[in-house]
Amino acid sequence: MNATESVMPADTQTLSVLVENKPGVLTRVAALFARRGYNIASLAVGPTEHPEISRITVVVDVAQHPLEQITKQLNKLVNVLKIVQLEPRQTVQRELVLVKVSADNTTRTSVLEIVQMFRAKVVDAAADAVTIEATGTQDKLTALLSMLEPFGIREIVKSGEVAISRGGRALADKSLLG
């Protein structure tokens, strides 16, 4: 697989899982997916606006197994507070990519034009390479990497997808704080 091929399986679903911010919770959640034979295509975890609650955003390959089965099992875990299946059209989804690209005196201007076109930014520069930071949808980042590939991609690191529902409603409300 080259750098521009999509790594997300075609049949995926995004779950937003609110959990108690305690040691071992992520391990139990990930172990549940593994035991049930689900492939996690993307995983991002971080604190919410409430320090005692963390949000796990997980993109799951559902080609082989129905999503309903895993949500029922997740709900049985003690530290899981809430699970929401995020619908793509009602959700803002983003990933972060850092990519180190070869860029010497002869190619640097072309690389920087691509950076500008994608509203990305250069976060480090050396005589023979630049490191670029970009955020966006998976499709946008795949397109960026495709345009940078001819220059020579030296290294890529991507975050997991993070997602939030559109509109004014919040996933974590005060009722979850018990």
Write out the residue ranges for each language-model feature.
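Long, contiguous binding/interaction regions
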Residues: M1-R55, V59-G178
